[in-house]
């Protein structure tokens, strides 16, 4: 027998005495006397910076012989990146633990706004524990006036935690530290109580099944076997950051060149990427005006660091299109210009790896004061208008932004004429776009714009065989690395477009979306829906979506009694029909045995246990 626990939320960074990272779940598993398993054997699947699995998985033994499986996910962005797996794990949980740090309102609101709605939809009345971890810093007696109740500072109050627990019907705990008392006796006592409850419920259900099978001494009804397991589709890992890094390294579609008269060489870049991360570059390239930004520090940073010089002649810069040469920009600070290649690599990598940037700058500049000055200028470039510079504490920022933070900012330029250098003509409408993003994210587009094709020199490019809505969804994926189809039909159209432009990861996303939508439909909806499942299968095969076509065949076989009654079932090929008949559920053998059993029951005038 096993117990499955799902832990969600970020309780903050905690450490063992030997400076090894720990947390609420791992500390409990390592210290509880009821849980067996040494420290090294607990962790089965640690999150790495490359693969980024959704959950960290722990396995141990509890109460002697009970298998304990814990899945822990501290970051919502990673949880949301594979919602197919995440939803299934929450749906199968016996206990859910929600945790946050009382000194970090960001982690509390992440739990409240993101995790709680998912739990409400997916969980089936399983016990929930809300753990508020940490001791509040600078906590004062709360003011009761209306002006103060709107904002309690950076600490999460007890009232807010209790209110969240009431909303979910959960048990609320405050753990001031991760010591033996709070972990072993307080948190552990509550968790082990719910574990015993779950074991009792599972044992009771098992005993009921045994009583039902042993109560009938005549001919036993036929046993309905479980349907075959559906093929599992694994999502392709994102290569968004490497795509834009390669764009910087290959110097394709360059439209801006930075230089300093006293520094040899130039630094090439792309306006669209720079503007997606910085209002300084938006102001420099006239994407926004000073009136739009309304932040004197950003305006001052732009004027102090950069100046456009359209008359400059730069023989060292690559000029792929002589008719539209890159824009020359003077960098007024020579030291900043000498480190600009490292700064751009930092920006193109997501602008969160501050420690690596500081090391790169320190290798070039020996003076620590100069290094601090350069880092401070980078922070000013990335500042958000009208807000205090949130990048003061780089380590905190790095911990909260492990993924790209400007993939959503690129959406600001989607289907907008700002900085656009190519226009697609679709169904009589025009869609502006940016060659740099298209070349970086799509190999077919890169070959089209860089080869000896008409599109390489043309600004207006016609697109055939795709609707405007589908093509806009395709561009949205290229710009943001995500998409959300409106339904199965649009997902199939987007899959066809992705196959046409050979974007394999988008194909996998569409496949997972279609599979998830079909799996979530109840039998009654499957029977009444107008969607032609056989036509969907044939399209998947025609467009080389092997994973989806194989899954659809298994889906038709598993729901044989529904789809065999539909007229399109006759459109299956001989090979497909043979596969469906072989793997159908329920099987022909079971239906024959059931008919014989019914006949026997009616002949003896007994009560049928099956029906």
From Swiss-Prot:
Chain positions covered by the region annotation Rho-like: 1-175
Keywords, alphabetical: ATP-binding, Golgi apparatus, Hydrolase, Nucleotide-binding, Repeat, Transport
Keyword check for ATP-binding: yes
Start and end residues of each BTB domain: 254-356, 420-487
A molecular function GO annotation: GTPase activity
Gene3D superfamilies named in the record: P-loop containing nucleotide triphosphate hydrolases, Potassium Channel Kv1.1, Chain A
Subcellular location: Golgi apparatus
Enzyme Commission number(s): 3.6.1.-
Class of enzymatic activity (EC top level): hydrolase
Region (Interaction with Rab9) location: 420-611
Entry annotated with the keyword RNA-binding: no
Swiss-Prot/TrEMBL GO biological process terms: male gonad development; retrograde transport, endosome to Golgi
Record's GO cellular component terms: cytoplasm; cytosol; Golgi apparatus
Source taxon at top rank: Eukaryota
Xref: InterPro entries: BTB/POZ_dom, P-loop_NTPase, SKP1/BTB/POZ_sf, Small_GTPase
Classification via CDD domains: BACK_RHOBTB3 (cd18532), BTB1_POZ_RHOBTB3 (cd18357), BTB2_POZ_RHOBTB3 (cd18360)
Biological role stated in the UniProt entry: Rab9-regulated ATPase required for endosome to Golgi transport. Involved in transport vesicle docking at the Golgi complex, possibly by participating in release M6PRBP1/TIP47 from vesicles to permit their efficient docking and fusion at the Golgi. Specifically binds Rab9, but not other Rab proteins. Has low intrinsic ATPase activity due to autoinhibition, which is relieved by Rab9.
Quaternary data: Interacts with RAB9A and RAB9B (at lower level compared to RAB9A-binding). Interacts with M6PRBP1/TIP47.
Protein name: Rho-related BTB domain-containing protein 3
Organism for this UniProt entry: Mus musculus (Mouse)
Gene: Rhobtb3
């Amino acid at each position: 027998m096993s117990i499955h626990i799902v832990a969600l939320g970020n309780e903050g960074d905690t450490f063992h005495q030997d400076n090894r990272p720990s947390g609420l779940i791992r500390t409990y598993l390592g210290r509880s006397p009821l849980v067996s398993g040494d420290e090294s054997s607990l962790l089965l699947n640690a999150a790495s910076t490359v693969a980024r699995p959704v959950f960290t998985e722990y396995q141990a033994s509890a109460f002697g012989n009970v298998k304990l499986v814990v899945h822990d996910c501290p970051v919502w962005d990673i949880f949301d990146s594979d919602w197919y797996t995440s939803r299934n794990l929450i749906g199968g949980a016996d206990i859910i633990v929600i945790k946050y740090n009382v000194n970090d309102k960001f982690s509390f609101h992440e739990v409240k706004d993101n995790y709680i709605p998912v739990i409400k939809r997916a969980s089936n009345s399983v016990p929930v524990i809300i753990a508020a971890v940490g001791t509040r810093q600078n906590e004062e007696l709360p003011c009761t006036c209306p002006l103060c109740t709107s904002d309690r500072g950076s600490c999460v109050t007890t009232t807010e935690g209790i209110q969240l627990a009431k909303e979910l019907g959960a048990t609320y705990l405050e753990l001031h530290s991760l010591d033996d008392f709070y972990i072993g006796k307080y948190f552990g006592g509550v968790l082990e109580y719910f574990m015993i409850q779950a074991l009792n419920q599972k044992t009771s259900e098992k005993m009921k099944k045994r009583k039902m099978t042993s109560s009938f001494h005549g001919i036993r009804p036929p046993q309905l076997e479980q349907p075959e397991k559906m093929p599992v589709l694994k999502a392709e890992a994102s290569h968004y950051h490497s795509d834009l890094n390669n764009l910087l390294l290959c110097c394709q579609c360059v439209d801006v060149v930075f230089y300093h008269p006293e520094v040899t060489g130039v630094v090439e870049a792309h306006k669209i990427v720079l503007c997606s991360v910085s209002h300084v570059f938006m102001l420099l390239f006239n994407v926004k005006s000073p009136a739009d930004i309304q932040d004197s520090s950003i305006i001052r940073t732009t004027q102090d660091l950069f100046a456009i010089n359209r008359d400059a002649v730069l023989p060292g810069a690559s000029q792929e299109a002589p008719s539209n040469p890159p824009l020359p920009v003077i960098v007024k600070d020579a030291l900043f210009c000498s480190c600009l290649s490292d700064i751009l690599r930092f920006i193109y990598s997501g602008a969160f790896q501050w420690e690596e940037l500081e090391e790169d700058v320190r290798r070039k500049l020996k003076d620590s004061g100069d290094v601090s000055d350069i880092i401070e200028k980078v922070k000013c470039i990335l500042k958000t208008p009208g807000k205090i510079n949130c990048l003061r504490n780089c380590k905190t920022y790095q911990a909260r932004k492990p993924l790209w933070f400007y993939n959503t900012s690129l959406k600001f330029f989607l289907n907008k004429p700002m900085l656009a250098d190519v226009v697609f003509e679709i169904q009589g409408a025009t869609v502006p776009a940016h060659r740099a993003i298209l070349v970086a994210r799509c190999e077919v587009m890169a070959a089209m714009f860089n080869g000896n094709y008409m599109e390489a020199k043309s600004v207006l490019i016609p697109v055939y065989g795709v609707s405007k809505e589908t093509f806009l969804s395709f561009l949205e994926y290229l710009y943001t690395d995500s998409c959300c189809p409106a339904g199965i039909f649009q997902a199939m159209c987007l899959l066809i477009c992705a196959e046409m432009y050979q974007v394999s990861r988008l194909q996998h996303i569409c496949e997972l979306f279609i599979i998830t939508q079909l799996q979530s439909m109840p039998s009654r909806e499957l029977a009444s829906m107008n969607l032609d499942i056989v036509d969907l299968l044939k399209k998947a095969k025609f467009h080389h979506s092997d994973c989806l076509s194989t899954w659809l065949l298994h889906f038709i076989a598993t729901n044989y009694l529904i789809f065999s009654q539909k007229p399109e079932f006759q459109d299956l090929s001989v090979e497909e029909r043979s596969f469906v008949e072989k793997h159908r559920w329920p099987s022909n053998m079971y239906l024959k045995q059931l008919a014989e059993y019914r006949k026997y029951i009616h002949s003896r005038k007994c009560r049928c246990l099956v029906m």
